[in-house]
Amino acid sequence: GNFKFSKLENLDQFNLKPAFLNEGIIFFDNKGSVLRFNDEQKIIWKNNFYSKSEKKLKPKLNFAINNEDLIVVDNIAKYFSINLNSGELNWIKNNSYPFNSDIKIFEDKFFAIDYKNTLRCFNIMDGSECWNLQTEDSFTISNSKFSLIILDGKVIFNNSIGDITAVDIETGLIAWQLPTQSSSIINETYNFKISKLVSDGDAIFFSNNKNEFYSIDVKTGTTNWINKINSNLKPILTKDLIFTVS
């Protein structure tokens, strides 16, 4: 069906997506209300957990589904969990900084990255923080969303200055880190764009708008190869081929 949402400015820039269910979808409006629609486009429930002043900030929400719960992180430093069936709040918390990534779930934990280039691991049950890992910060705020993937017991993610970091999922300790940009990038992060990370299980692939397309080893973080391709769009893997659009 054609679901209609109240207007959100710069939607493409923030790479925001609805949460798709077996029957219907979940999305949000420009005041941060979360809405569940059925397949007939009828609203099953609609709830808002923001104060009057927070609603004026037009929070932008990222979703992940875990069994009967919807996990939400936003760009005004809140994160919360909602019961999918009732729309009622399980818990809500504040982070030190706004979030700037998708959410990844692994067993009883979920992961997200904030604007301070900090990867945070939270407990799904109550939202308590299990651990966090801050990577080097930049002087300007990134204009593109950070990406994270989970492989071989590690969370692997990028930050605003192009570092790719692998972290042990249980301990939060760094397994390896690969800087892909020179130190001068710290001043230029607003214009630096990097694609989402994708993997075939052995290598991680990503590209950026600095004319670099990388393949790096999952286990060690060493560079397999770099090609000259200018793209910040997510690469697509099919068997032995990689597709990208420059």
Where are these regions (language model features)?
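Extracytoplasmic beta-rich repeat domains
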Residues: 1-22, 43-67, 88-107, 128-152, ...
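Structural signature of WD-repeat beta-propellers
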Residues: 29-30, 38, 67, 74-75, ...
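Short loop/turn segments that connect beta-strands within beta-propeller blades
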Residues: 38-42, 83-87, 123-127, 169-172, ...
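Repeat-solenoid scaffold signature
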Residues: 154-162
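Short, catalytically relevant binding-site loops at active-site mouths
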Residues: 163, 211-213, 230-234, 243
